[in-house]
């Protein structure tokens, strides 16, 4: 296990403990799977990696972790919700979403691009009398596999 993974597990355990919840083996396995997957993952993708996990317990743990803002859903372009750790644990990033198969990959832009995006959002928000609390950029297109 990488040092970063240890740090994430420690932070997750702490957040759950502060809310009176336990970092059970099932929750830890789920966080491990999401860390290993490295991008938003659907329940079928997660179950394929750990077939011994029951689907019902996975959904229950996903709901608990989502309620605690440890993970969140990322909507793709198919019938499967995908889950990933929140930015508190894996850092700020954006998504490339395939409109054909629904796969989602993470990407990071440079600090100067983030500043330009923040500036553009602030300008649009002022015009609309809107308060921006954060942003995420989802780029839609075709993944390499679907372009073939």
Feature map (PLM): residue ranges:
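Pre-recognition alpha-helix immediately N-terminal to the DNA-recognition helix
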Residues: 28-33
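Short capping segments at the starts of secondary-structure elements
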Residues: 23-25, 37-42
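Basic amphipathic alpha-helical segments that dock to polyanions
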Residues: 58-68
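A short acidic, leucine-rich amphipathic alpha-helix
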Residues: 45-49
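Non-DNA-binding regulatory cores of transcription-related proteins
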Residues: 68-148
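Short, Lys/Arg-enriched N-terminal segment that forms or immediately precedes the first helix
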Residues: 6-20
């Amino acid at each position: 296990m990488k040092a970063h993974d240890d740090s994430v597990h420690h932070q997750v355990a702490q957040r759950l403990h502060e809310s009176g919840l336990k970092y059970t083996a099932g929750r830890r396995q789920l966080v491990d799977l999401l860390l290993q997957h490295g991008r938003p993952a659907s329940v079928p993708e997660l179950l394929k990696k750990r077939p011994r996990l029951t689907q019902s317990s996975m959904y229950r743990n996903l709901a608990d972790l989502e309620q605690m803002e440890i993970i969140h859903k990322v909507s793709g372009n198919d019938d499967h919700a995908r889950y990933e750790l929140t930015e508190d644990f894996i850092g700020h990033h954006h998504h490339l979403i395939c409109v054909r198969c629904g796969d989602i990959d993470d990407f990071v832009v440079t600090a100067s691009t983030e500043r330009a995006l923040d500036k553009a959002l602030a300008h649009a928000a002022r015009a609309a009398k809107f308060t921006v609390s954060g942003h995420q950029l989802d780029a839609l297109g075709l993944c390499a596999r679907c372009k073939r």
